[in-house]
Amino acid sequence: MRVVIDQDLCGTTGQCVLTLPGTFRQREPDGVAEVCVATVPQALHAAVRLAASQCPVAAIRVIESDAGDDERASADPARSPAEAERHAAKDQRIPGGHDGTV
């Protein structure tokens, strides 16, 4: 199993770090989550799935793999409407706090 974080989507809440501090960390100074391990040990699979399910912005993706099989994502790789909306909203933000409206 592998786990990846969509760092553009990460809300910097730190929920994943609170759930599994040895697997996730928040980088300085922006607080965006990072994965600390290349592959997840078998003993932590359930906890990683829990962390992914608890992410408030659904930025964590668990990639399951079976020996000899191609990797497959645990969730549909297509974005949900809510996730697409969050990405669109984040893409429209302009640094400095101005949202671009007149």
Swiss-Prot record:
Its cofactor is [3Fe-4S] cluster. Keywords: 3Fe-4S, Electron transport, Iron, Iron-sulfur, Metal-binding, Plasmid, Transport. Binds 1 [3Fe-4S] cluster. Electron transport protein for the cytochrome systems. It comes from the Bacteria. Pfam families: Fer4_15. PANTHER family: FERREDOXIN (PTHR36923:SF3). InterPro entries: 3Fe4S_ferredoxin, Fe-S_cluster_ET. This is Uncharacterized P450-system 3Fe-4S ferredoxin y4lB.
